[in-house]
Amino acid sequence: MSRHSEEFLFLLFSILFIGNTAMAQMQRQWTIRGDTLILYDGQTQQYSVDTPADKGVMSTLISEEQLQQELKDAGIELPKYRRTVKKALPSILQTDRQQYTARLPQNITIRFIAGQRTPNADIYLHFPYGIDVTPDNTFINIIGRGEVPLRQLPQQSAGRYGDRLSYQQVGQYSLKDNGAHGKVLHLKGIDLRILNKYDVVLSIKGVSIEQKKYQLEAWYTTKEPQPLMSEKTQVQIEGVNRIADLKRLPYCRNTFSEEFLPTTAEFTWTADPEHPYTELLISTDSAATWSTVRNLDKEEYLNEMYVTGLEPGHLYAFCMDVKEGPYQGRSNVEWFYSGMLNVKKYGVRGDGQYDDTDRLNQLITDMSAHGGGTLYFPEGTYPVRTLVMQSNVWLFLSEGATLQAIPGALPPEFTWYSDKDYRSGLSPTDPKPYRDPDNYLTKQDVGHTYFYNAMFVGERIENVKILGNGRITGNGNIVTGDKVMNNEPHRRCDKMFSFKLCNNIEIGGFTGKEDLWYDEKTDEPYYLKGDSIDTDISNMLRIDQGGHFVLLATGTDYVYMHDTYFGKEKQNNVRDIYDFMACNNVRVENIYSRVGSDDIVKLGSDCSLGFTRKAKDYSVRNIIGDTNCNLFQIGSETADDISEVYVDNIYVLGANKAGFSISTNDGATVSNIFLNSGKTGRLHHRSVMKRTRTPFFLSISNRGRVIGAHAEMFSFKENNRQRNELLITNIPIGKVENISLQGVDISEVYGGSSFRSDRWKAFDGSQKESTAIIAGYKLPDDQQIDGGLSFVLPDSCHTRYLRNISFKDISMTVKGGHPKKDASAMPPELGVGKYNVGDFQIQPAYGFWFRHVDGLTVENCSVNCEKPDQRYGLVLDDVKNDVLHNLSFPGKKNRKWIQRK
């Protein structure tokens, strides 16, 4: 086989693997060298969602049938000789480009992916002499944890975890200088059981290389289930005497109108400051012929420039032509498709019958490879299974365009662990989620654990937008249930949009209008236009039947969701709307959800990445909707801290749980959460809550579902009731601090969502209703537990108070009607896996019930009852440092207003 064929083979497997992580965890089970086929015979551990829990260990030796098929698919004849070696599967090694401008400082980015999963890996990267790698100029990102200087790798945070976790350090390194033979970077103790697209990303900053070729090498060792070493994988780069880093910068903007048409190209490069005279060349015939578009001199540019007025609908090529000096000659070529590419002109049918998935994925891949651009969907219906999104590609849906899910989405990923110990449930007695402290799959519900079984998926990509005023529908083919993996393989899609460790994601309609609000008479949203209203909502993106998640964004930053109408055409097959797990810098605004079965905006942090990640900086405004759960929720997944969350202008049409909920259960600190502070923009109305089982639900429990956690069964008495339940022994109780809620009008306090019901059924006494609940958490005392309490939590705190909680300017009218005996109700402490309103049973107050709170302000609040209620208006149970001012409760027919315990 020729060298070209070998390179093609490597590229083929690289593309298959990088483009679709879900399809295989073992890549390249064979290699061809000359006339010899090399087969790798070792062991790995790998589970699909169907693999029995004890059957994950498997051989890496490819079967003869599969080998023949792969050779056939690659167009390669079976080589003359065959050899089997006892090696780990080869790794993949990539650089961001093949050529670099010689003698000018540039960054070199290297990506490494081990051929198979393993704990406690050793990874070796060899850099030839001339590529100067140091602990200070090299930055490293291990499995997506975030980039840090190499020198700081041993100190990088491993996230939040319990002391039973095997790996409490991201890794260590050594850098051996072999003089003229280069340097070897040795990464030690790397946990590669998790696959987040790339295992290691290295960025070497400001490197100057000479005009020559350099060969980089990488290899690694496995520890389990069998100690193995891989062969060396090589990649070659070259220093050249020409500009090699001309780059077209992708469009990045957060406003998108119907008239948007990208016709400007922006470029950057590293220029030689001594020889500035350069021309920018343009080609309209795929780089066959060139003409000058700009003459540049030193005063006209600083390593960047724009080209404007390009004709839409054309593919342009650009390059630099340096006229003098050591870099004289033409640079690398960059591409730009001006305007938007009409997908129907490139083989996509959009006829509602033909499966357009493969052609659309090819267009997305091609557009990304050419630097990005916008795909335009004209009127039509486009059936798709899974669209694999790529960096810098935008989708524009015209008003008559419908993207429609069909069966056959990508399967869930292969994983090192089995998830069968826990996929869903709320049991306080089930120890299986904690059985293996390292198994990150069992620390959250199955819907959060897998990412590729989605209608749209992206992993470690950036600058992706799905915009317009068309429609996206799951069409009944996206599953809502927790038992999704019991379905046939082609029916396991449970997410519409799934983004994992991405940056700069936007989904929504056309922007430019003002604030969205709601008209009770028409039961429709409208836009505010100054002091008037605008009932034209045709700018909104329409989404329906989104499955378990319309959006699951995990470890994804700079997210913008806006101007979307959920459920206009169909209201079934929808559960959560927006789930943000461990995301930062998120904006959500102008959202209307006609009805759904779960949270509309939900924030959390889980273990699905194999590590935890903090969540911070949220701006949420103008959210209107009806839900079977909560309109706004923090939790239940709270494996890491969540802070700086600003919510303004919410309108709850119905909620069978809470209008506004904060629930920390897994040890995280939730802090600095504000409702109606005005931080996100204008407070155009008071917030409204109607038909909520409870308006507010703030709670703490110690479920402790985080990697490294340990749980034991205990028997104890509480309120004269025997409880036999799990208690978490090594995870601190979470915190809720600095919460300010104000400016809300609340009425019809009962679970009155129209989910699977009339719109809306009036209160008849059968619906569930609760007080505003604000409750910390206390472990049972030593004397309450049979045999005593056998552990002390890491911070020695066994009662966690909510701290600095403020309610101001709240007007509430409740149903009332409770008898005198309910005033003596003693709600239980929340057990493991219990975090819902109903778990507190009946409360002794009809207005606010506070327990385990330190630092409380209730000011300018009023509570009224439709019927006399024999409970207290406000109960303070184990509350410290409270300030109550200007409160109003009903008169003589009700009991005493306030009770202190």
Q: Could you say what each language-model-derived stretch is?
A:
Residues 1-9:
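Bacterial N-terminal signal peptides that target proteins for export
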Residues 10-19:
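Bacterial N-terminal signal peptides
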Residues 16-17, 25, 81-901:
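Extracellular/periplasmic carbohydrate-active domains that bind, remodel
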Residues 25-31:
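Cleaved targeting-peptide boundary
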Residues 33-68, 77-79, 99-116, 204:
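N-terminal targeting signals for Sec/Tat export/insertion, comprising classic cleavable signal peptides
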